[in-house]
A protein has these predicted regions:
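Structured adenosyl-cofactor binding patch, chiefly the S-adenosyl-L-methionine
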Residues: 14, 19-20, 141-144, 205-244
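Active-site/ligand-binding-proximal alpha/beta "capping" segment
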Residues: 173-227
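Surface-exposed amphipathic alpha-helices with a cationic face
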Residues: 45, 162-166, 240
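Short, acidic/turn-prone active-site loops that include or flank metal/cofactor-
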Residues: 31-32, 56-57, 130-132, 199-201, ...
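RNA substrate-binding interface of SAM-dependent RNA methyltransferases
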Residues: 15-21, 50, 87-181
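N-terminal positively charged helical leader segments and presequences
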Residues: 1-88
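Glycine- and other small-residue-rich loops at beta-strand/loop junctions that grip anionic moieties
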Residues: 5, 29, 102-103, 128, ...
């Protein structure tokens, strides 16, 4: 589990409470009265959440980020066991769709990816303990609270997770420029795990050696790559398209 941390932003706090996260306390800016703030107050009262009104200066001391007049302290997020999650997804008769993040270290990219993964019905996100972005306030806010609505698994080594997925009948597909195969030419309409690489290095070469397939997005401009969260969205929505 991560150490206790803060989340900021009204919508992210609402999502956390509604998803059943253990919110210890919410600090609300005095005299804040937007419609979204009123929604937060209703959600807190229904959930019997401890809160207090504070000057904006206190909120600014709690976080340098755009807090929108609300900061919450939240208990650590529980991570899922990968093997148990795979079994649960398969027992429920779902066609598994997993997302593996190979040492993506930027918290905002991580949050954006989590948000897209939740929107596209990903059954679980898998990250490596070492070298991966933490689940912190930036992650939670960028994900718009989606981090509380999708299972996240932490593993010692990405390769071990890939071997487990493959042994469970789940195809592994790595997003990489080091292939001639286009994402639109491979099947994602089956149990599959999509692997996205780090912002600077991409998918680790040792990982590329063991995956079932490699695929890339077509590029038509002079810049040869996309932000990882954007590329991830393109891959996931292609999976959605094929499964629809």
């Amino acid at each position: 589990m991560e150490k206790e941390h803060q989340i900021f932003g009204i919508r992210a706090i609402i999502e956390a409470i509604q998803a059943g996260a253990t919110v210890d306390k919410v600090y609300i800016q005095k005299e804040a009265s937007s419609e979204l703030m009123k929604d937060l107050m209703k959600v807190m009262k229904r959930g019997n959440i401890n809160f207090s009104y504070v000057p904006v200066e206190k909120l600014n001391r709690l976080t340098p980020n755009n807090h929108q007049g609300a900061v919450a302290t939240i208990s650590p997020i529980s991570f899922f066991d990968l093997e148990s999650l795979i079994e649960s997804v398969q027992e429920n008769g779902k066609k598994p769709l997993f997302l593996i993040l190979d040492q993506i270290s930027d918290a905002r990219n991580f949050g954006a990816i989590i948000r897209t993964a939740e929107c596209t019905g990903v059954n679980g996100i898998i990250v490596q303990k070492a070298g991966s972005a933490p689940v912190n306030g930036d992650t939670v806010k960028t994900s718009a609270g989606a981090v509380f609505n999708i299972p996240i698994c932490k593993v010692e080594h990405i390769k071990d997770a890939i071997f487990l997925l493959q042994a469970s009948g789940i195809k592994t597909v790595a997003a990489t420029e080091k292939t001639d195969q286009n994402i639109y030419d491979i099947s994602l309409n089956e149990p599959v795990a999509i692997i996205m690489g780090s912002e600077d290095r991409g998918v680790n070469p040792s990982v590329l050696k063991i995956v079932d397939e490699k695929a890339k997005l077509p590029m038509f401009g002079t810049i040869g790559s996309l932000n990882v969260s954007v590329a991830c969205g393109a891959f996931l929505y292609e999976a959605v398209r094929q499964r629809s």
